[in-house]
């Protein structure tokens, strides 16, 4: 695996104050399955936070599957994203989706957030 395709701690939102900043001042992107809160950051790379609640997915196995897919798609697209903080929240409809549909939905969001010059 290439060094720039990992998922180090530096590209995650880890502290409550980081989440508060995003929830307090963010623009929203949504579809039938997900809501993304996006806020510009002062760093040089995008950072990801997850807020997958029991309201969205009742069973822990479903919440973990959703989180795993979000982390994986973010990791694959991170180098093309603008320097933003992103918090991903899901909607109850997503629990009935298969992995391919979840990936497709998330990839549309990452494409919207990608920097114009990152795609040659």
Curated annotation (Swiss-Prot):
Annotated EC: 3.1.26.5
Catalytic activity: Endonucleolytic cleavage of RNA, removing 5'-extranucleotides from tRNA precursor
InterPro entries: Ribosomal_Su5_D2-typ_SF, Ribsml_uS5_D2-typ_fold_subgr, RNase_P
Keyword Transport assigned: no
Gene Ontology, cellular component aspect: ribonuclease P complex
One record GO biological process: tRNA 5'-leader removal
GO MF: 3'-tRNA processing endoribonuclease activity; ribonuclease P activity; tRNA binding
Classification via Pfam families: Ribonuclease_P
Broadest EC class assigned to this enzyme: hydrolase
The keyword Hydrolase appears for this protein: yes
UniProt KW keywords: Endonuclease, Hydrolase, Nuclease, RNA-binding, tRNA processing
NCBIfam families in the cross-refs: rnpA
Function: RNaseP catalyzes the removal of the 5'-leader sequence from pre-tRNA to produce the mature 5'-terminus. It can also cleave other RNA substrates such as 4.5S RNA. The protein component plays an auxiliary but essential role in vivo by binding to the 5'-leader sequence and broadening the substrate specificity of the ribozyme.
Complex formation: Consists of a catalytic RNA component (M1 or rnpB) and a protein subunit.
Family recorded in the similarity comment: Belongs to the RnpA family.
Annotated protein name in UniProt: Ribonuclease P protein component
Species whose genome carries this gene: Thioalkalivibrio sulfidiphilus (strain HL-EbGR7)
């Amino acid at each position: 695996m290439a060094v720039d395709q990992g998922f180090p701690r530096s590209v995650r939102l880890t502290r409550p104050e980081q989440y508060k900043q995003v929830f307090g001042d963010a623009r929203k992107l949504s579809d039938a399955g997900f809501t993304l809160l996006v806020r510009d950051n002062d760093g040089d790379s995008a950072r990801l936070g997850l807020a997958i609640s029991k309201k969205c997915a009742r069973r822990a196995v479903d919440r973990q599957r959703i989180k795993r897919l979000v982390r994986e798609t973010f990791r694959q697209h991170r180098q093309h994203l603008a320097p933003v903080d992103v918090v991903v929240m899901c909607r109850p409809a997503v629990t009935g989706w298969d992995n391919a549909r979840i990936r497709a939905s998330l990839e549309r969001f990452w494409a919207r957030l990608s920097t114009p010059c990152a795609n040659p």
